[in-house]
Amino acid sequence: KRNNKYITQIKIKGHAQFGEYGKDLVCAGVSAVATGICNTLAKKGFLEEKKCAIILKNGNIMIDVYENDEVMQVILETLVISLESFTEDYHQYIKITYEEE
């Protein structure tokens, strides 16, 4: 979800159905990229500073942005670009929805 040019929320949910549970390489790739981004946001202090929140529930990931920060936007754009690159090869297994606030 975006407000003008800034990312305000990212949701990653569901299962790619590329392979059986536990052996799905598409899910593993998406999870690895998303986990790396979440760890980066935490290490850079954005969670502690309450500029964003990460909600992990039932295998789903949601990142909510409360206060805009240019560095955080670069990190989040990295996630979006990585997910978009997955869709180039696995478009039948990954759906990206873009919303404007």
Language-model features and meaning:
Residues 1-25, 35, 39-101:
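N-terminal intrinsically disordered, cationic/polar leader segments
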Residues 32:
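Phosphate-binding glycine-rich loops of NTP-binding sites
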